[in-house]
């Protein structure tokens, strides 16, 4: 809607639905190819033939629980997939805006991380995203790749996959089931509405210099238990009837918190 031409590439794995794109499929400035980001040669063709200036790399496996059960697909998609994309960018001269995660910093404890802080990923998902970041910066140093790195906090919004926390809460309550809550439920996350992340991304894309890293966050923190209680309050349901405490997951970071002052 802002005059940009957009070319989408999506493998439509279990978490992707073409139906989510129904509002843009008929737009004259939107095109779509269904393929894996591991298809490097096809990516080169798409970028070159469509004169694509920026590749916005959002493709990733992101569910931490799944990464603990089986990390192979996370390494394949998040690391090898990123390598495939930046190989295509280097070959065609395109720049990349790479989406990472606030989880690469590790547990925040009392501080809010800034972009220059060291990375300390503590689960297979965040480790795969940190590895992808290092690939991007290594290609910048070695091959002259131009990039922007974005590290967002927890996003929520329309059409989010049902495995994520807020959709899980809503689905469980709707079905009359209890919401499983890890440990004591006091793990804290920083929440941001997806449209605000989109606005921030556009601002960065239009205003940033090359080879910069940005935290993107709202400053709004809430513990997992309190998120459930808030949803229950909105829906008029007794929170005591909605929560089932379960064994904490391995390596569960207590808190994530990032400082996005650089965007101001």
What are these regions (language model features)?
Residues 15-16, 41, 160, 222-226:
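Residues that form or flank phosphate/diphosphate-binding pockets in enzymes
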Residues 131, 135, 139, 169, ...:
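Hydrophobic alpha-helix immediately C-terminal to the catalytic Tyr-X-X-X-Lys motif of short-chain
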Residues 111, 162-170:
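A glycine/serine/threonine-rich, flexible loop-to-helix segment
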Residues 1-155, 195:
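N-terminal Rossmann-like NAD(P)+-binding domain of SDR-like oxidoreductases, especially those catalyzing
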Residues 4, 35-36, 173-264:
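C-terminal substrate-binding subdomain of Rossmann-fold SDR/epimerase-dehydratase oxidoreductases
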Residues 12, 125, 154-157, 187-188, ...:
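Short histidine/acidic/glycine/proline-rich micro-motifs that form metal-
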């Amino acid at each position: 809607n802002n005059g940009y031409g957009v070319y989408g590439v999506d493998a439509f794995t279990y978490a992707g639905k073409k139906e989510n794109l129904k509002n843009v499929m008929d737009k004259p400035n939107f095109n779509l190819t269904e393929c894996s980001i591991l298809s490097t040669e096809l990516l080169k063709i798409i970028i070159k033939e469509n004169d694509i200036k920026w590749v916005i790399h959002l493709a990733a496996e992101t569910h931490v629980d799944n990464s603990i059960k089986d990390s192979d697909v996370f390494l394949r998609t998040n690391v090898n997939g990123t390598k495939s994309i930046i190989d295509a960018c280097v070959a065609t001269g395109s720049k990349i805006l790479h989406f990472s995660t606030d989880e690469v910093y590790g547990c925040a404890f009392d501080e809010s991380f800034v972009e220059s802080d060291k990375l300390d990923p503590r689960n297979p998902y965040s480790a795969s995203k940190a590895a992808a970041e290092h690939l991007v910066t290594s290609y910048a140093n070695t091959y002259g790749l131009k990039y922007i790195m974005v590290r967002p906090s927890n996003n929520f919004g329309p059409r989010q996959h049902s495995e994520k926390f807020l959709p899980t809460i809503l689905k469980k309550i709707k079905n009359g089931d209890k919401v499983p809550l890890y440990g004591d439920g006091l793990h804290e996350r920083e929440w941001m509405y997806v449209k605000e992340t989109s606005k921030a991304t556009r601002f960065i894309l239009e205003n940033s210099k090359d080879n910069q890293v940005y935290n993107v966050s709202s400053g709004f923190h809430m513990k997992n238990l309190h998120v459930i209680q808030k949803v229950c309050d909105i829906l008029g349901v007794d929170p005591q009837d909605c929560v089932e405490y379960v064994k904490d997951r391995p390596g569960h970071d207590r808190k994530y918190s990032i400082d996005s002052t650089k965007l101001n």
